[in-house]
């Protein structure tokens, strides 16, 4: 039976080399479980999985970017920052009423899917200014091609400024990149395995007590 690369704790698949190709749904599932294993709530983990799939659609090395985002300290986490910005989008005190600057962000391109959702909810394009590059997100389909930005992945300690954009020019559509390196897959799979830890003796006893009460 073929190995399922999204199943937590699965044996490494039959790699033809150091890189394997996953589908968008496989990337999303693996990323969601890994994010949960890394300590995010299930709701946050689902958002992280969605963002990872979005980044892959934009032509970026999404699994590796997610892994670095999960490794970041909480204060530098692009996942937590992106989720906060997205949750507050559209409110009177929303994040883009005035420019917002985030300091010391790890893997800042992970913010991009969340800012696309911010733009969608606000009904206005949003700029992400990273100093050397400015990315305009309209929130409309298709997902833009960001493959030219692969060279600025791995950044740490970045300064990111988010503001309402003065431009609504749509970028060319992205081309899906489902490649994942063996080491990245193994690290994400190890995190995903943490979601399948057996129940503790205390939790089993509690479950038994609840069953007895219902007899």
Where are these regions (language model features)?
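Short, structured coil/loop segments at alpha-helix boundaries
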Residues: 41-42, 107-109, 177, 181
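Extended, charged low-complexity segments
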Residues: 148-215
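A glycine-rich, acidic short-motif signal
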Residues: 63-145
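Glycine-centered secondary-structure boundary/capping sites
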Residues: 18-21, 39, 59, 90, ...
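Proteins with a high burden of low-complexity, intrinsically disordered sequence enriched in S/T/G/P/A and R
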Residues: 3-20, 44-45, 130, 148-156, ...
């Amino acid at each position: 039976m073929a190995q399922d690369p999204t199943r937590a704790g699965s044996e490494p698949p039959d790699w033809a080399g150091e890189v394997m190709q996953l589908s968008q749904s496989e990337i999303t599932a693996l990323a969601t479980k890994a994010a949960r294993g890394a300590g995010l709530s299930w709701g946050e983990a689902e958002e992280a999985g969605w963002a990872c799939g979005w980044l892959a659609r934009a032509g970026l090395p999404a699994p590796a970017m997610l892994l670095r985002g999960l490794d970041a300290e909480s204060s530098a986490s692009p996942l937590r920052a992106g989720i906060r910005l997205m949750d507050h989008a559209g409110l009177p005190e929303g994040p883009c009423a005035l420019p917002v600057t985030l300091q010391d962000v790890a893997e800042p391109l992970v913010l991009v899917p969340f800012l696309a959702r911010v733009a969608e909810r606000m009904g206005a394009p949003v700029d992400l200014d990273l100093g050397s590059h400015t990315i305009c997100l309209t929130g409309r389909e298709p997902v833009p091609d960001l493959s030219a930005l692969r060279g600025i992945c791995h950044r740490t300690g970045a300064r990111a400024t988010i503001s309402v954009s003065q431009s609504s020019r749509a970028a060319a559509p992205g081309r899906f990149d489902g490649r994942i390196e063996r080491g990245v897959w193994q690290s994400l799979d190890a995190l995903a395995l943490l979601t399948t830890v057996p129940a503790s003796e205390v939790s089993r006893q509690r479950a038994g007590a609840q069953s007895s009460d219902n007899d």
